[in-house]
């Protein structure tokens, strides 16, 4: 057990259960402002991709927007505490709070019932176990529910509801298959045009080539994240030769392990991708929107099943499943030439049916009626 990780968890518990509730009670002296909506995140210094569509929608509706973004992983304890205090001050009187990941301050107190917290969870589908269903995410000794104040958790399809309820320790009625707001962008021609132009500028060497994107999830927890298979992808790129441009896009927790230079997010790379290689990442579900070939490269599959586990039968998903590097090149060539379009369609309908380009509209409707 990593002693630094354990100490960090106990500090979090102290701040969440003792300090922040006092700040909240002190600040909630005014009436709740139903025209005020707070967008907050502790993993990004700027607005996360997951929030863009809803942000544009609430601005169009004339709501007062407050943004509270800071990467707590980079900040000092005092800087993070200052940011938490700023959030609690606006949280105490805001009508709505929007988050897209675990956000400790929002769960630190018994919030006012008039304030609604919307969780735009960043991942589609429900593939690997997460949250309270695995100690890798939330240790058993951690006291408090980091998601308890969420009034609405948006998911990509009705199938996801019971699994999110279990992972988040929330009643099923709070898990709503309204769709994942950010996926609306995949249906907008202007967004696709912009990302293609940005891609051309960032990757001029890809001109005239097929694009292969490797986008794995991370292993372990956010504080001790690691990746699997990077050397194999490097060797694959050499085998594929000049016909392909191979791009690596790691989870945000792992970006620091790659050379700097790639400023495009995975969501911005998907529209220009001809073939995706992933493993247990929810990006697989995003990619179903484009109905293009994919390969699941999982060299640690047996170990992952034992230590983490899944909400579904992983082996039934579309795309070639490859456990050995020896089979990776052949699988990529085969899938690129001939892939099962019907399997992709059925998988989309089961796990992504609410991601139809109108998710933000449904979320806005809920927000107005809440």
Residue ranges and their predicted role:
Residues 34-35, 115, 209-212:
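Nucleotide donor/acceptor-binding cores
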Residues 36-190:
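Active-site and donor-binding regions of nucleotide-sugar-utilizing enzymes
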Residues 81-96, 248-285, 289-290:
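Donor nucleotide-activated moiety binding/catalytic core segment of transferases
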Residues 107-126, 230-236, 291-303:
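A short, gly/pro- and small-residue-rich
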Residues 355-370:
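C-terminal alpha-helical cap of glycosyltransferases
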